[in-house]
Amino acid sequence: MKITTSGRLTILLGRQQAATGERRSLRHLAHLANVPKDFVYRLDAGEARYVDLDALARLCEALDCRLDDILVWDNHGRQPI
């Protein structure tokens, strides 16, 4: 099983912009969630090796989303047990 985050934050920011009309950048998201901008950029690029769960919770709060909106599980076609 693989977990990916590639592009998820950008997609969620786009959805938020469509709903509210307010344009936000990854840098602004990092500021709102009080997390390092480098973490946000690495997470969106799918390059984060370790993930701070508190930081993820703050990102979810800032984006008004759930954890599985950011983290995508790929089972490679296998069914869960």
Describe the role of every protein-language-model region:
Residues 71-81:
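Short, charged recognition helix plus adjacent turn
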Residues 14, 45, 75:
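Residue-level detection of the helix-turn-helix DNA-binding "recognition helix"
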Residues 23, 47-58:
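Short, basic-rich loop-to-helix N-cap that marks the start of a DNA-contacting helix
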Residues 54-69:
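DNA major-groove recognition helix of helix-turn-helix/homeodomain DNA-binding modules
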Residues 20-43:
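Short alpha-helical DNA-recognition segment
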Residues 1-28:
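A short, Lys/Arg-rich alpha-helix, primarily the initiator
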